[in-house]
Structures are given as structure tokens and as C-alpha cells.
From Swiss-Prot:
A lipid is attached at C3 (S-palmitoyl cysteine). Pfam families: SmAKAP. The modification Phosphoserine is found at S40, S92. This is Small membrane A-kinase anchor protein.
């Protein structure tokens, strides 16, 4: 007895089924050595487009945003440092 799934045949050939394979059947993998494909040279000329100049408005916005993020991070660190400054740091000696 057993479940029906265990009685179903395995979809891939087993060792025993491989022995039963007829000589006329082609193997799954060719016996030739698989070589990597080499890219064929292409004589297509592509125009290299220069990226548009950086917009000063975007640079100023990015700088201001990074300054705001840095300021908020420092303020958060200072608040946590004040809150937990009296708790000693214990370095673990174990792994």
C-alpha cells in the first residue's frame, strides 16, 4: 500500500531504464564537446551620444536633500546617545 503519487513513475530515466535504451535512440546530450559561442564581428557604426549636461537645479536639490538626511541622522544619533549614555557597553568575549 502507499499513496498514488509514490506509485507513479519517475519522469526522468533511471539507471535501469538507461540500460534498456535501444542503440537506435539518440542520447539526450550529444557526445560532442560543447563550445562557447563566439560573437561574430559586426561592422555597424553606432553614434555615441553624449549625455546631456547636468542640470544645476537637480544638483542643488540633491545636495540640499543629502544635507537634510545627514542633519536628521545626526540629530537621531544625538537623541539616542543622550537617552542611552548611562548604559555601559559590554563587549562579548565569546563567539
Amino acid at each position: 500500500m502507499g499513496c498514488m503519487k509514490s506509485k507513479q513513475t519517475f519522469p526522468f530515466p533511471t539507471i535501469y531504464e538507461g540500460e534498456k535504451q535501444h542503440e537506435s535512440e539518440e542520447p539526450f546530450m550529444p557526445e560532442e564537446r560543447c563550445l562557447p559561442r563566439m560573437a561574430s564581428p559586426v561592422n555597424v557604426k553606432e553614434e555615441v551620444k553624449e549625455p546631456p549636461g547636468t542640470n544645476t537645479v537637480i544638483l542643488e536639490y540633491a545636495h540640499r536633500l543629502s544635507q537634510d538626511i545627514l542633519c536628521d541622522a545626526l540629530q537621531q544619533w544625538a537623541c539616542n546617545n543622550i537617552k542611552y549614555h548611562d548604559i555601559p557597553y559590554i563587549e562579548s568575549e565569546g563567539p
